[in-house]
Amino acid sequence: MSASGYKAGYISIVGRPNVGKSTLLNHLIKQKISITSRKAQTTRHRIHGILTDVQSQFIFVDTPGFQMRHRSQLNQVMNRVVLQSMQDVDVILFVLEAGRFGREDEQVLEQLPRNLPVILVINKIDLLPDKLQLLPFMQKMADLFDFADIVPVSALQNRQLSDLTEVIRHYLPENPPVFTEDEITDRSERFLAAELLREKVFRQIGEEVPYSVSVIIEQFAVEGNLRRIHACILVERENQKAIIIGKQGKKLKDMATQARKDMEVLFDGKVYLEIWVKVKSGWADDAIALKSMGYE
């Protein structure tokens, strides 16, 4: 690709938990690389998703949901990731849920830089009970911050995402591409395997357990078209271990099957997956343990 007139830049996606940031990223790049669930704090790491076309390269930075309710070391690390992600980028997407602007959204708004183009993305417009509420909500938000642009979308239904892409393109600087055309993320297959398994835990288990769960890939071997993966699901208490395993191991088996299928689609090959569940008390408040697990 010629660098002449070509645009490339980093776009940080920020917002409170559960506004649909990861779903937005996955649909923008047309590939699932960031895990999703209805539970807060599903995303824990900064993940780059890359969309490349003949005119531009969009390097999206998905981030954890910013929130101040929990004070664990893990939550502090995730909030720090969000704040760092708003530095050294070219554009920021501030994602809100249509018709909803609460204290947690306000806390994110207070962190937004004034020296960068910030695009307000109003997501989940399909869930707005009265569509006439949208324009007043957009005006309300425009009065609170000098947004470069405001774009209403439905990430889940792929509505107006092409419009959003064109708005972002306008604000990207002229640069040669950073990544090759076929790269869709900066994360390794090992990392993505851990995330896909953690997603299944979040989706299958009740409200409390997921926040005490982490996934560690202990072995990742590539043998031709086969990937052999040994994974450990880490929890904080014995009763959580029992919940994840389930009666006669059924829950764990179901999670393993679903994760393996997703991995085979993403990696375009066969996957042999073995999973263990281990207890490590207090890991979410252990700075050394968090660092060893790859938390920034």
Curated annotation (Swiss-Prot):
Keywords: Cell inner membrane, Cell membrane, Cytoplasm, GTP-binding, Membrane, Nucleotide-binding, Ribosome biogenesis, RNA-binding, rRNA-binding. It comes from Nitrosomonas eutropha (strain DSM 101675 / C91 / Nm57). GO terms for biological process: ribosomal small subunit assembly. InterPro entries: G_ERA_dom, GTP-bd, GTPase_Era-like, KH_dom-like_a/b, KH_dom_type_2, KH_sf_prok-type, P-loop_NTPase, Small_GTP-bd. Residues 15-22 are annotated as: G1. Pfam families: KH_2, MMR_HSR1. This is GTPase Era. One of its GO terms (molecular function) is ribosomal small subunit binding. The gene is era. It is found in: Cytoplasm; Cell inner membrane. It is a peripheral membrane protein. Residues 153-155 are annotated as: G5. Belongs to the TRAFAC class TrmE-Era-EngA-EngB-Septin-like GTPase superfamily. Era GTPase family. Residues 205-281 form the KH type-2 domain. Gene3D superfamilies: 3.30.300.20, P-loop containing nucleotide triphosphate hydrolases. Residues 7-174 form the Era-type G domain. Residues 123-126 are annotated as: G4. Residues 41-45 are annotated as: G2. Residues 62-65 are annotated as: G3.
